[in-house]
Amino acid sequence: MKHGSLIGLVSGIAVSMLGSAAIAEDAPFRPEPGKFPPLEKAHVYRGELVFVDHANRRGSIRVQGEGTYFRNPPQPFAMLPYGMVRYHAAPADLRDLPLGTVLHVRGYLPPDPKTSVVPVLPVNAKDKDHGYLGKGITPAENHLLLLEDEPSHCLREGKIWKLKEVNITNNAGTIVASRESKQGQTEKADEETLTLDGATCIWRGRESLLVEDLIAEGIWPNSGKKSLEGQAVQLGITWKPNAEFTQFHISDIWLDDTAMQFAVRKQTETHKAFIRSRWMPARVDAVEYGKFGHATVTTTLFGGMDDSLYTDFKKNVPALMNGAENTLKHTAGVHGPAHMASRGSILDVIKTDEDVPLGNSGIQVRFKTDLIIEGIRPGRVVRVRPDSWPKVKLPREEYLEPLFGIPQKRFPTPYIFPKY
């Protein structure tokens, strides 16, 4: 990914989200099926990733509320079809996120409660007082538009962490820090005490260091406290059990831009390889039916991908298109997605100059096939593979056999177990 492309992507997301948290309405918002929801309607919360079902793009988060964090039960979430995951300030998949990572969330009510892949909660669930746990820990807005880790959140919003003081004992201890705007701010930022230990990774340029390395260099004390004088860094934040009711842990410290950009590049390459093997997700806007199975399909590619993936969609390029669930799991095909996918070619690629909502790439692709399949209908989700992308065999859990191709059977049933 080119540096300019990265800055453009981060800036674009930042502009589209500017002030969204502040102006979000109190009333819960339910997206309309087939439409990209306005970001300013999203409910904002934060918590620790506890469970992941990557094949179905869902999981659970322990939401940070007003009370004792460690007692909060994990809450289910599902990514919207066009929902974006970002890790280390780059596009990602749920499988890329380590358990325990503290994530920032933008979510809505389920678009259609009848087909939700996670439990549907009362719309006012986040307002319920849970005693010692406090309020805000059970949001009904569990269908997510954006899920991002700490450095992704800070880089998108133009923020940094400033380290004030470190206190070390036996290669572990605490850091006092505050999250602040890079441009400076008039109000004093709240300071937070975060833990760190011998496993905390410290990135300096291309180097990977540990706490003991900074101690050996005399940068941090072997024991006791030292002022860090507001050193600007980016932090990776997790949670681990300790004696405090609510205290978070530092998994990574990026000391400079070179270190952070190296992490961005690495995650971007992981993302590109993943999408090329699983195909680009898109929404069907229109289908023009011809005779004997011929059809022309207009789709909108989902947003949040690396720019280089979109450039692979070119006029007259051969392509495959397959139906998908809202979980982005391929449907049909006993032997994998390519088995029953519609084959054809790209007629045109149309890019809009207008502002588009988050989750929308602003790119339409017109695709012509001589044998359209059932899953390609207006409003449905599909996945598209241009001919230049690799032909791979997906693992069994990432596509549905025809038996499971109806909504009532999208979850595994006893059929998956052998008969003895």
List each language-model region with its residue ranges.
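Short, flexible, surface-exposed loop segments at domain boundaries
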Residues: 19-82, 87-420
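Bacterial N-terminal signal peptides
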Residues: 8-18
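Positively charged n-region of N-terminal signal peptides that target proteins for export
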Residues: 1-6
